[in-house]
From Swiss-Prot:
Residues noted as binding ATP in the record, renumbered to the chain: 621
Places the protein is found: Cytoplasm
This enzyme's EC code(s): 6.1.1.4
Keyword Aminoacyl-tRNA synthetase attributed: yes
Record key words, sorted: Aminoacyl-tRNA synthetase, ATP-binding, Cytoplasm, Ligase, Nucleotide-binding, Protein biosynthesis
Full protein name: Leucine--tRNA ligase
Motif ('HIGH' region): 42-52
Record bears the keyword S-adenosyl-L-methionine: no
Principal subcellular localization: cytoplasm
Organism field: Aliivibrio salmonicida (strain LFI1238) (Vibrio salmonicida (strain LFI1238))
Entry's family note: Belongs to the class-I aminoacyl-tRNA synthetase family.
């Protein structure tokens, strides 16, 4: 063992050993408990960022800890390689997406290896290869044959800049989440998978996910959006077909004064065809896409269609308005409006001079006032004919029953969740394996003709997908007849919805090898960002149920435990140029002056300009405040970067990047290295004789085993990695001060250092590997995690505080099993206590076992 800790040489040597020994390559082993740990795989953007490093360090710490628990641990890695950034980069760099992607994969793979992550590289794959997406294509055709896939023309969010469809959740403030272009509505044929058929199960099974954060489960519950209500029919004057409406408040039915319909509703389109002004309004509504969350605050706009609906129970005519707050893809695209009891309806009615008829009053019988605002609470019905006096649930049931009896409605369950639109009008994605013959019939591509391969040698013009532009590519045959291929590609969430399962058998000649998949699945620990709560994590749960129902897996859920790591923040600085726009300056190019409290007083960039500090914000390219992990590894070593990442903040909270903190982690690791080196250069140690230890030695050993117990719980159960490291640091402070004079002192230090080195191993595997060897042990990668000695935690002696009239006057060292009488006798005869009791009469003596002797005297 070298005297100086030199991470660069050490880490490369140990990484080569792991590669050569295939340390982390695993196979199924029925004799061992398995543990499958997975971090969300990266998009090969070109370079790792600190968010990646944090995610993958957490996963590696969990994996290495579980391996030392004796489990058969699989930790795979791969590449989420399809997607729009590759197309944009290809246009910018005048290349094709494929070579750009593969070059990035090679570069990032080397970066991951330099950080010492214990991946089973034999399972690596990239989702953009036909060997991967071929099985996705075949599974899609199986879903089609089962009736779970369909194609329909639908109104979609269209980004005119990226020339692609966006999911609702990819629309932010009416603009594309990627390029900030205003989103338009466009009708195009789309492929859908029927996730709605699994909505109830997806909702119910959230209750089985005890290892998931409550916040993620709540977000999914809200996204699925189950509600119980009534679907009812309003007849429409002059129309054969009734207008179907869904409501969760049938108790307010007698207060309906108009019906609102979406701009895309067939009735709206029919009326707009005869009314140019209405047509212009519906077009405006279509192209002003709003997220559901914004409906409450947006300005309510509408226009009378001229059509009249007939109230299903009292026969009253009410106007039908096209309203900008009614969504076509929720419920039926039509709402019954009750202005007196719904604030949105109230604002609309007030604006357009429509009737406001209250029919619900508070349960205490007091009058309801709707002169300024709607009364939205549940209460008791009035002015509702035969339903007067009924409370909410009774009214709900009675009105639903009457509607059903008259054939005008029924109770129903509705979900906010829509079927999953998987078509994308992009090139760099997996081709959808469907063809259309000349008679207009659509067919899945037969399995023996899969994969439908995406051509990689293409030229990108930034506008049209090469497979759409190349008319020859689409030409094919089906059963000997001419046919055209589908030129849309899959939403890239398709690939990431089942990759976790493919890792179990990446070479299988099917989507999965059921035997291997059922050994490894479900994933025991999944690590990734909370931004994926409603898309990737929901789609993966859905895909797992599809795989189960196809007979590939037996489990119901893909991920047992989920850890959502916090973001990595960094200081951001900007300079305002002559045009008044902000130029973001990299923190590494800024010199900082701080006040006594550590706050930034002044910041100057490398050109001598004073720059403004914008605070600690998420690392991003746009703010130029990212820190290159490569530079940090080159400067401090991978172990130091890993240790800082795990120590600086709880794993699920934001982490503030401070180079001073990295320097602190480096100093600590050097102190551990120094103590191990000093200890090992003194030669071998004799066996530890626990029975012969002195009081001080027992106390130190107790600290060692308390630390083992705490670190084991913090990493294994609580996942508070930062407090585990803090406990090891605290122990190291004691070990640095511990005497080394006697043979038993050295034997005790030997036991303690071995425990410290193994406890640090998940965070700092390279340094621990070398120190473990120096301590005379072999291969830390396969050693056992230290177990704490319960006997060592038992204290032989206890310190009892003596209080006289509420003030600390003495401390007693007593045997751990001393009786109350013995403690009282010692306390009342203690030399210090006697001084303060001189001349006083003892009135009361109270003993708190093992802690305190309280004497009251006057």
């Amino acid at each position: 063992m070298q005297e100086q800790y030199n991470p660069q040489d050490l880490e490369q040597k140990i990484q080569k050993h792991w590669d050569d020994s295939k340390t982390f390559v695993v196979t199924e082993d029925a004799s061992k408990e398995k543990f499958y740990c997975l971090s969300m795989f990266p998009y090969p953007s070109g370079r790792l960022h600190m968010g990646h490093v944090r995610n993958y360090t957490i996963g590696d710490v969990v994996s290495r800890y579980q391996r030392l628990q004796g489990k058969n641990v699989m930790q795979p890695i791969g590449w989420d390689a399809f997607g729009l950034p590759a197309e944009n980069a290809a246009v910018k760099n005048k290349t094709a997406p494929a070579p750009w992607t593969y070059e990035n994969i090679e570069y990032m793979k080397n970066q991951l290896k330099l950080l010492g992550f214990g991946y089973d590289w034999s399972r690596e794959f990239a989702t953009c290869t036909p060997e991967y997406y071929r099985w996705e294509q075949e599974f899609f055709t199986k879903l089609y044959n089962k009736g779970l896939v369909y194609k329909k023309t639908s109104s979609v969010n269209w980004c005119p800049n990226d020339q692609t469809v966006l999911a609702n959740e990819q629309v932010e403030d009416g603009c594309c989440w990627r390029c900030d272009t205003p989103v338009e509505q466009k009708k195009i044929p789309q492929w859908f998978i029927k996730i709605t058929e699994y909505a109830q199960e997806l909702l119910d099974d959230l209750d089985t996910l005890d290892g998931w954060p409550d916040m993620v489960k709540t977000m999914q519950r809200n996204w699925i959006g189950r509600s119980e209500g009534v679907e009812l029919s309003f007849a429409v004057n002059g129309e054969e077909a009734p207008l179907e409406v869904y409501t969760t408040r049938p108790d307010t039915l007698m207060g309906v004064t108009y019906v609102g319909i979406a701009a895309g509703h067939p009735l709206a389109e029919q009326a707009a065809a005869k009314n140019p002004e209405l047509f212009a309004f519906t077009e405006e509504c279509r192209n002003t896409k709003v997220a559901e969350a914004e409906l409450a605050t947006m300005e309510k706009k509408g226009m009378d269609t001229g059509l009249r609906a007939i109230h299903p129970l009292n026969g009253r005519e009410v106007p039908i308005y096209v309203a900008n707050f009614v969504l076509m893809d929720y419920g039926t695209g039509a709402v019954m409006a009750v202005p007196a009891h719904d604030q949105r309806d109230y604002e609309f009615a007030t604006k357009y001079g429509l009737d406001i008829i209250p029919v619900i009053k508070p349960e205490d019988g007091s009058d309801v006032d709707v002169s300024d605002v709607a009364y939205t609470e549940k209460g008791v019905l009035f002015d509702s004919g035969e339903f007067d006096g009924l409370a909410f649930q009774d009214a709900f049931d009675a009105i639903a029953a009457k509607l059903e009896a008259e054939g005008k409605g029924k109770k129903t369950v509705n979900f906010r969740l829509r079927d999953w639109g998987v078509s994308r009008q992009r090139y760099w994605g997996a081709p959808i394996p469907m063809v259309t013959t000349e008679d207009g019939e659509v067919h899945p591509v037969p399995a023996d003709q899969l994969p439908v391969i995406l051509p990689e040698d293409v030229v990108m013009d930034g506008v049209t997908s090469p497979i759409k532009a190349d008319k020859e590519w689409a030409k094919t045959t089906f059963n000997g007849e001419p046919a055209l291929r589908e030129t849309d590609t899959f939403d890239t969430f398709m690939e990431s919805s089942w990759y976790y399962a493919r890792y179990c058998s990446p070479q299988a000649d099917d989507i999965l090898d059921p035997e291997k998949a059922n050994y490894w699945l479900p994933v025991d620990q999944y690590v990734g960002g909370i931004e994926h709560a409603c898309m990737h994590l929901l789609y993966s749960r859905f895909f797992h149920k599809l795989l189960r129902d196809a007979g590939y897996v037996t489990s119901n859920e893909p991920f047992k435990q989920l850890l959502c790591q916090g973001m990595v923040l960094s200081d951001a600085f900007h300079h305002t140029n002559e045009k008044g726009t902000k130029e973001w300056i990299a923190p590494t190019d800024v010199t900082i002056e701080r006040d006594a409290k550590g706050r930034i007083e002044k910041a100057v960039d490398d050109q001598g300009r004073e720059v403004q500090h914008s605070g600690m914000i998420k690392m991003s390219k746009s703010k130029n405040n990212g820190i290159d992990p490569q530079e940090m590894v080159d400067k401090f070593g991978a172990d130091t970067v890993r240790l800082f990442m795990m120590f600086a903040a709880p794993a699920d909270m934001t982490l503030e990047w401070q180079e001073s903190g990295v320097e602190g982690a480096s100093r600590f690791l050097k102190r551990v290295w120094k103590l191990v080196h000093e200890h090992t250069t003194k030669g071998t140690t004799e066996a530890l004789d626990v029975a012969a230890l002195s009081g001080d030695q027992k106390a130190l050993r107790r600290d060692v085993h308390k630390t083992i117990a705490k670190v084991s719980d913090d990493i294994g159960r609580r996942q508070t990695f930062n407090t585990a490291i803090a406990a090891i640091m605290e122990l190291m402070n004691k070990l640095n001060k511990a005497p080394q004079g006697s043979a038993q002192d050295r034997a005790l230090l030997d036991e303690a250092l071995k425990a410290v080195v193994v406890m640090l191993y998940p965070m700092t595997p390279h340094a621990s590997f070398a120190m473990w060897e120096a301590l005379g042990e072999s291969n830390i990668d396969t050693t056992a995690w230290p177990t704490f000695d319960e006997k060592a935690l038992i204290e032989d002696e206890k310190t009892i505080v003596v209080m006289i009239n509420g003030k600390l006057r003495a401390k007693l060292i007593v045997a751990a099993d001393a009786t109350e009488e013995q403690v009282k006798e010692l306390g009342l005869n203690d030399e210090n206590a006697l001084k303060f009791l001189d001349g006083l009469t003892i009135r009361k003596v109270i003993y708190v076992p093992g802690k305190l002797l309280n004497i009251v005297a006057n």
